[in-house]
Amino acid sequence: MSADRRPLVLIVDDSSHVTGPLQILFEETGRRVVIACSVATAVRACEAERPDLMLLDLSLPDGDGLSVLELLAGAPALPPVTVALTGHDDPLTVQRCRAAGCRDVLLKPVPVRDLLRRASEWLPGEAAASSPNG
């Protein structure tokens, strides 16, 4: 297990146009990043890495992104904070995400400043973890 105490963000999306910029953004602001592009790889990443935050696209090649939460329900590998990323802002989608356990639902594309501000709210302990000796 890594001694690196920086917050770990799991980005689950099958588009490199989404994951690439998000990875750069989070790494430049002191977080570690793991990328998953499917339900199956997201579940494996949660089990292996235990992320602090999961940004979860709802449309994945092997199923509904919310099925990641269903597959990990009650397991220690379930991230403490999951945020849904979607291109659909209809009330039913938001309701489904909240019912599945998502802390927040963000409409893509997410403004960078908004995402950084919210990430600081979702990861309250990251200030100490981002110190040079952290």
Model-based region annotation:
Residues 57, 86:
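Active-site residues of response regulator receiver
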Residues 16-34:
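Two-component/phosphorelay signaling modules centered on CheY-like receiver
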Residues 35-53:
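Acidic, metal-coordinating helix/loop segments flanking the phosphotransfer/catalytic sites
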Residues 61, 90:
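The feature encodes the CheY-like receiver
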